[in-house]
Amino acid sequence: MGSCSPQLPLICLSDQTLKPGSSKWVKVRSDVRKALEDYGCFEAKIDQVSMELQGSVLKAMQELFALPTEAKQRNVCPKPFTGYLSHNGLSESFGIKDANILEKAHEFTQQLWPEGNKSISKMIQLYAEKLAELDMMVRRLILESYGIEYFIDEHLNSTYYRMRLMKYIARPDNDITAAVGANVDNGANDNADGDANVNDDGASIGVKVNVDVGDDVNDNDSVNIGVGVDINVETNVNGDLDAEANGDATAWVVGAVSGNASVGAKEANVDAELGLPSHTDKSLTGIIYQHQIDGLEVKTKEGKWIRVKPAPNTVIVIAGDALCALMNGRIPSPYHRVRVTEKKKTRYAAALFSNPKEGYIIDSPKELVDEKHPRAFKPFDFVDLFNFYHTEAGRRAPSTLQAFCGVSAGK
């Protein structure tokens, strides 16, 4: 029965045997394109990050999250929602811009310790550097597969990286109201607080939504969660809440339905397990590593959920809305969520996201626009897209990307 369950494509991206121009490179290039066109993501078998480094990063994350709250709250950034975020002690995350640059990694640990922590800084920087090399390989493969090699250097030079270190704690039971309450968000100016949100029909749903927003995420203070796992899409409320799937943001949902009688026990239990609701990323690409405990689930075009199981030396490569727009819709940004089901176990995940630099105009290369594939999105500055997320129209749109720059959007 298990063998019939849908699975993401698994592609070997070992840099020891994968060289540009080789027959393997050509084969992998084709596989990457097909996987992204079909699923918007894939699992990658890698050797760029050693098991020793993976273990060291996990220990570093455990040390970071074990710090006193007042220390963790010093992880603040100039832009709101890009620093430390905690929700009821059940989920936390750190944000590190340009984590692949040692100086920036040092700045991060200096926020937490008076003298910093050079060992952890170097470990984070090395980890981010290895994942960044992998990301650049993937994006090179993508652009080559569409015959736009001339665009590779410009594209790679127009982006930067942000790392997210994340911790989820599963509930001790399935009490779906146990986690609704106050949150702490130190790097933010405001919260998307969905306690007792009221939907369009006037029904109150007891959901706590805290959104950690950076350069490329929607802070959605009107999200309705709980009437089925995909309520964001079905009720015309933007589901683009990003965390483990967004370059600059983390949305943490801890709590579920408290007042909707139409929701069955099974659906309510699923919602109670959500550490992150169904959403798409805003980044170009994301590389996610799940440490030992699974939780990430990806939605297929057929509407089925694929639960991605952690495996040694594997990561998940996922496309975001920015890549979808750049590639003229050829590559979708898939809906995904985090659902922690193992009781009394802590889940750690680390992710690196590539994002367009401020001022760079995202515009599909002419080679990707033809009669079969008419232009799907207007050129736009990523910062303008981010600002649109904060408007009422941006929050309410089923697809913020489509509403902002889709050719059919009334703009």
From Swiss-Prot:
Listed name of the protein: 2-oxoglutarate-dependent dioxygenase AOP3
PROSITE patterns (UniProt xref): FE2OG_OXY
Annotated cofactor note: Binds 1 Fe(2+) ion per subunit.
Class of this enzyme: oxidoreductase
Keywords recorded for this protein, A-Z: Dioxygenase, Iron, Metal-binding, Oxidoreductase
Single GO BP term: glucosinolate biosynthetic process
GO molecular function, one term: 2-oxoglutarate-dependent dioxygenase activity
Family of this protein: Belongs to the iron/ascorbate-dependent oxidoreductase family.
Gene: AOP3
List of residues binding Fe cation: 279, 281, 336
EC number: 1.14.11.-
Role: 2-oxoglutarate-dependent dioxygenase involved in glucosinolates biosynthesis. Catalyzes the conversion of methylsulfinylalkyl glucosinolates to hydroxyalkyl glucosinolates.
UniProt note on tissues of expression: Not expressed.
List of residues binding 2-oxoglutarate: 347
PANTHER family reported in the protein's UniProt record: 2-OXOGLUTARATE (2OG) AND FE(II)-DEPENDENT OXYGENASE SUPERFAMILY PROTEIN-RELATED
Cofactor(s) listed in the protein's UniProt record: Fe(2+)
Highest taxon listed in the record's lineage: Eukaryota
Span of domain Fe2OG dioxygenase: 259-356
